[in-house]
């Protein structure tokens, strides 16, 4: 199995501002890629909630005569790029370049912002802008395919579907949404809905809020993997889902109480004609799709890492095998 290289960097989307209005929107990225055969992988040394695989930091990429396939990864609500490192690492072992971003204001890598949690559509533009960016391409020094696959977990699944043509009818927490959310915010921001009235007086938020029904489809994204899509997908315009023709693989867990599969995954599958659905059995919860924990992670947030009677690694192995086969079949 080929060594996996890993690099990180910071791009900017100069077409959009950060939430403070003090500069361009940041796109902090992480990339897993097939490294050359001589690359030396070393275990991570920095403390983390997540178990991390050994990688070859900034190693030369394994060059081939063909352009390399790219998979863009989108983390869940309040998460980080490394939250999909388990998938990125396995994709790289199979020859893919897996590029993930920390979604500004909606990531644990920086202070949470209610704007970031409310304006989920900005996440789609993050991936489009990052795919355009030159710095990660120059850092890796290879030729890449001019189209990409996209995979996302939870809010990341919402992001993936926006790029494939889903359009917003209602934000999950907007007052006019006829489908009332059973919660007022996610685990990371439980009073999120209460921030909307005051934020509507903020120019930067209002500009983004008024973009929510725009079309974020990017024709360069040719397939999508939606892992445990959250309740936010129920705010998509149904006719836009019916018009998606790109292949979509939906994966959920039978014991997901955050985004119940029968409520979210099954609903999407019925609306997206080009989709396939797999609901994993055996007590698979929402957070099973996050990385395996370290002792530090278990101590800090046991509810995220509790898996009753299952091996999280085996679930990740299965999802990664499904993803690799799916993306290879759609190239």
Where is each model-derived feature located?
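Short beta-strand immediately N-terminal to the catalytic nucleophile in serine-hydrolase-like folds
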Residues: 150-152, 251
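Short beta-strand/loop motif that positions the catalytic acidic residue
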Residues: 244, 250-252
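Domain-level recognition of soluble alpha/beta enzyme cores
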Residues: 1-72, 93
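Gly/Ala-rich beta-loop-alpha elbow adjacent to hydrolase catalytic centers
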Residues: 152-156, 160
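Conserved alpha/beta-hydrolase "acid-adjacent" motif
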Residues: 234-236, 257-263
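Alpha/beta-hydrolase active-site loop
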Residues: 90, 116-146, 161-162, 167, ...
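Short substrate-entry loop that stabilizes the transition state in hydrolases
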Residues: 39, 53-56, 60-68, 73-110, ...
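Catalytic active-site module of serine/aspartate enzymes centered on a nucleophile-bearing elbow/loop
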Residues: 284-331
């Amino acid at each position: 199995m080929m060594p996996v290289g890993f690099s990180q960097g910071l791009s900017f989307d100069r077409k959009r501002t950060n939430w403070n209005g003090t500069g361009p929107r940041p796109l902090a990225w992480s990339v897993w890629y097939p490294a050359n055969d001589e690359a030396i992988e070393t275990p991570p040394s920095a403390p983390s909630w997540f178990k991390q695989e050994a990688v070859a930091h900034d190693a030369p990429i394994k060059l081939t005569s063909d352009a390399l396939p790219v998979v863009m990864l989108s983390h869940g609500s309040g998460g980080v790029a490394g939250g999909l490192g388990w998938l990125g690492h396995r994709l790289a072992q199979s020859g893919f370049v897996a590029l993930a971003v920390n979604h500004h204001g909606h990531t644990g890598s920086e202070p949470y912002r209610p704007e970031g949690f409310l304006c989920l559509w900005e996440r789609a533009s993050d991936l489009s802008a990052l795919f355009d960016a030159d710095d990660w391409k120059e850092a890796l020094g290879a030729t890449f395919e001019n189209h990409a696959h996209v995979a996302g977990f939870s809010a990341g699944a919402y992001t993936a579907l926006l790029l494939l043509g889903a359009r917003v009818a209602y934000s999950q927490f907007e007052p006019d949404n006829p489908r009332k959310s059973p919660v007022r915010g996610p685990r990371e921001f439980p009073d999120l809905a209460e921030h909307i009235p005051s934020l509507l007086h903020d120019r930067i938020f209002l500009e983004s809020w008024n973009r929510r029904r725009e079309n974020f489809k990017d024709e360069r994204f040719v397939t999508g993997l939606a892992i445990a899509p959250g309740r936010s997908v129920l705010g998509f315009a149904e006719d836009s889902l019916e018009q998606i023709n790109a292949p979509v693989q939906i994966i959920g867990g039978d014991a997901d109480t955050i985004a119940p599969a029968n409520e979210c995954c099954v609903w999407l599958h019925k609306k997206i004609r080009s989709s396939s659905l797999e609901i994993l059995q055996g007590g698979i919860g929402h957070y099973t799709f996050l990385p395996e924990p370290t002792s530090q992670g278990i101590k800090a947030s046991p509810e995220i890492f509790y898996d009753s009677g299952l091996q999280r690694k085996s679930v990740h192995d299965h999802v990664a095998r499904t993803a690799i086969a799916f993306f290879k079949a759609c190239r």
